[in-house]
Amino acid sequence: MSIEWYAVHTYVGQEDRVQDQLMDRARRLGMYRTKIFQVLQPEEEAVEIQEGGKKVNVKRKLFPGYVFVQMDVEDDDAPGELGESWEVVRGTSGVTGFVGTATRPVPLSPEEVQRLLTSVGVAAQPVVEEAPRIKVDLKAGDMVRVTSGPFADFSGVVSEVNAPQAKVKVLVSIFGRETPVELDFSQVAK
């Protein structure tokens, strides 16, 4: 796996649409955060003076006709060959090609990446994979004990489990009343 930044040609004025469509396609095809990581199109805020002297704040593209994609273009099964992610980017409506030769995109140099990320106010950082999902054997109606936080050592009944957020809602008896408390999975035990 070789994750690099690439400049992608687009039709001028289509940068926003290309960015949205590309991220949508990456998510739908299961490539987001595995093959296609980020799509950027640096902008700057400017003040334009219109007729009559009225000042208007506008966003202006720093690189009209380009978006920048952080991705792995190689085929996992054939190192050195271009993979499906390359086809996904090239096949996105509004994309006219990669910067490079007709058969091989050329990645940006580290200096170019640093300038690009600085222009959008992001420090260059290595890609961090998503944290693994925590699997917890909890369901509504389970009796649990709170192990940490302000309700430590209280017991309660699980009323709701939110697995994507790794949260659980527990009904804790406080002063004789059932009070819902939202906790992280790590704060409760059966």
From Swiss-Prot:
Record-level GO BP terms: DNA-templated transcription termination; regulation of DNA-templated transcription elongation; transcription antitermination; transcription elongation-coupled chromatin remodeling
Entries under InterPro entries matching the protein: KOW (IPR005824), NGN (IPR047050), NGN-like_dom (IPR006645), NGN_dom_sf (IPR036735), NusG-like (IPR043425), Rib_uL2_dom2 (IPR014722), Transcrpt_antiterm_NusG (IPR001062), Transcrpt_antiterm_NusG_bac_CS (IPR015869)
Residues covered by the KOW domain: 141-165
Domain of life: Bacteria
Gene3D superfamilies: 2.30.30.30, NusG, N-terminal domain (3.30.70.940)
Alphabetical list of SUPFAM superfamilies matching this protein: N-utilization substance G protein NusG, N-terminal domain (SSF82679), Translation proteins SH3-like domain (SSF50104)
A GO cellular-component term linked to this record: cytosol
Pfam assignment, any one: NusG
UniProt keyword Transcription present: yes
UniProt keyword terms in alphabetical order: Transcription, Transcription antitermination, Transcription regulation, Transcription termination
Function recorded in the entry: Participates in transcription elongation, termination and antitermination.
Family statement drawn from the similarity comment of this UniProt entry: Belongs to the NusG family.
Protein name: Transcription termination/antitermination protein NusG
Gene behind the chain: nusG
